[in-house]
Amino acid sequence: MRSYVHSLAAYIYFALFIAATGVYFSVICMSYGYTDYSQYVFSNSTILYIVIVPILTMRLFAEEKKQRTDQLLYTSPIRPGSIVLGKYLASVTLLAMSMLVSLIEAGVLSMFGSVSWKTVLTGCLGYFLLGACLMAVGMFVSSITDNQMIAAALSFAVVLFCMLLPNISNVVPGRARYTYLVCVLAVLLVAWFFYDETKNMKIAAGVGIAGIAVIGVLSKVKPALFDNGLSKIIDWFSVLDRFNDFCSGILNASSIVYYVSFIAVFLFLTMQGIEKRRWN
């Protein structure tokens, strides 16, 4: 957290967030009298993450690797999990602090009309969880490169891709064979991950064969699952689609579990990468 205070990253983030939400708040809510803060401010402000996430995460690990100070982390008695969680919590703390600005704006809006605080708080939670997911991705990207500019560019590309997923799902081919192909490639990727972690070809081959066998059985038993399968897969993985429920005031437990699981996966991947470099 101290590194954020002594750098421009936190100040740039707060300036961008306050400026963007302030514009949407004043132009849409105050000028036109719309009191649905979540729909008009939070929904439109998601585009900010394309810039905010790279700014806040690019230095988390990349800068330390460049300056060779990461060796101090690898040789210290502190566990990799504690290092990753500490850095991650520092970045999401800034995100949580910015939510206070949104609540202040919603409070001002309530003085001029009827504001549904349930929708505001639900939208605030959704906006925070969406940002927390993208922060976890950005931190993982920062951990795999030693150049913060490259980390920023990769984070920008990944976040932009996440934002475009709902549009991509509308243009992907709907034929079942494309779904089979993507599923098989995903299984092979998982098998490669097991081999990379265990260096055991038998385990990796077993995972790959079992996964492909499951795909084959499902294609025979429930072939309808693979019709427009790519769109279904993309929609399921889309972090932005789930955020829309929060903006509508819908507190969906499955969406919360999805976001938390998404965060946990990328924190785990970051921890594994650090642990691997620590032993190497």
Predicted stretch roles:
Residues 1-75, 88, 98-104, 133, 193-198, ...:
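Hydrophobic alpha-helical transmembrane segments
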Residues 24-27, 148-245:
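Transmembrane helix segments
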Residues 11, 81, 148-149, 254:
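Residues that define the loop-to-transmembrane-helix transition and helix capping
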Residues 60-90:
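Helix-loop-helix units of permease transmembrane domains in multi-pass membrane transporters
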Residues 3, 63, 75, 107-111, ...:
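Transmembrane helix-loop junction
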